[in-house]
Amino acid sequence: MAGAGIAAGAGIALYGGVYPRSQMFGHTTCWTSARRKLAITFDDGPNPAITPKLLELLERYKAKATFFPVGKFVRACPELVKETAARGHLIGNHTETHPYLTFCGPDETREELRLCNEAIAEVLLERPRWFRPPFGFRNPWLGEIAQQHGLQTAMWSLIPGDWRVKPAEWLIGRMKPIAAHAQENSGQGKSNAEAGNTGKGDVLCLHDGNFRELNGDRTHTLKALEYWLPRWRDLGLEFVTMSEGTSG
């Protein structure tokens, strides 16, 4: 019986720390407030090899996005972070070194958020308001610590796995649910009320960098967005930041 209790407790903790929509370890945002608002987000940058091209692509379609850079890369590429914000995109906190927060104690968790906040504030002269945990992994004290730093936790409704080394065509296929959801909401498909997201829009998690190194190859992410942005636009989707997507 004791073993069963331990296993059950471990299962609950795993659910709370890994499942994106779990609110067990603090409130998380996985959807936008309106079905036509698509929040495209990028983790693990800035990336000198890809982020500038990505900014040009987003500009072409008048798309605003949210970037969650790693603090150590913010310090390495401050001008790129500054340019990203100057183009109207939102900058969030993705920790200083991209650890597995599941295995971090309160002090280490607090330091990871603090250092990344400071790195961003040094560049933009203001602290971020949004935070995304690396790998989406959380711990029991993260919610309170994020709140102490004035951070809201952003998760996602779709994460297609663009960190994997796969052809762009594979990633394009993995991003199909965004269009399917838009068509459902427009009445072209069946209602998705059973999914509990009626009237809500998607938060898409992509990666413009590789947390292990600068200049990581994310060409497939760029190509997939080149394919989908005009199609999403034609479906009537509005590309918004996390703050824009959760207001109103």
Region spans (language model):
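Charged helix-capping and loop-helix junction motifs
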Residues: 108-113, 168-173, 218-225
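Active-site beta->alpha N-cap acidic-glycine motif
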Residues: 17-102, 108, 112, 119, ...
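Alpha-helical scaffold elements within enzyme catalytic domains, especially in hydrolases
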Residues: 57, 83, 145, 230-231
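Catalytic grooves of carbohydrate-active enzymes
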Residues: 179, 183, 196-243
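His/Asp/Glu-enriched short active-site or ligand-binding loop at hydrolase and phosphoryl-transfer sites
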Residues: 143-186, 192-196, 237-248
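A cross-family glycoside hydrolase active-site/sugar-binding cleft signature
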Residues: 41, 66-70, 92-94, 132-134, ...
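Conserved, mostly hydrophobic/aromatic
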Residues: 43, 58, 91-94, 116, ...
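Hydrophobic alpha-helical topogenic segments used for membrane insertion/localization
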Residues: 1-16
